[in-house]
């Protein structure tokens, strides 16, 4: 990776420490094949963002810098993502099961303090990374 800011091994170690701090089981031996494969793909996305310097683990929290692929007024914005709380789950109250995108935006809003509409304007790369973190939180 040409724009590697930190080594893959360090990024993986920080990811594992973050999972432990958040209560996320990252041992794929405890998962069925489909869950292990899904977890591994999501982990790769987070590790890649960490290696590039866009995502930084900070004492159990995450600071994510929106990439320059998102619109100008979003690129470079730093989002602090704290430890998961009950707010993640109550953010989805009242939404129908069919409103998956809206639920995910509500969870991302609860994670970052940004309004739901903020995420709709991000480039897919940034959205998918934040969505991945949200999914990890929802699996606790």
Regions found by a protein language model. Give the residues of each.
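Short, surface-exposed, charged amphipathic helix/loop patches that serve as local interaction elements
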Residues: 1-140
């Amino acid at each position: 990776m040409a724009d590697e800011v930190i080594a893959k091994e360090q990024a993986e170690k920080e990811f594992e420490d973050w999972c432990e701090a958040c209560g996320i089981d990252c041992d794929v031996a405890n998962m069925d094949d489909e869950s292990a494969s899904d977890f591994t793909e999501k982990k790769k996305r987070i590790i890649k963002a960490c290696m590039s310097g866009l995502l930084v683990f900070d004492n159990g929290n995450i600071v994510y810098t929106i990439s320059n692929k998102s619109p100008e007024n979003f690129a470079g914005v730093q989002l602090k993502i704290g430890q998961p709380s009950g707010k993640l789950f109550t953010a989805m109250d009242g939404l129908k099961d069919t409103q998956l995108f809206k639920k995910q935006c509500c969870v991302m809003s609860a994670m970052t303090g940004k309004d739901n509409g903020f995420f709709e304007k991000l480039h897919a790369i940034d959205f998918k990374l934040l969505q991945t973190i949200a999914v990890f939180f929802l699996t606790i």
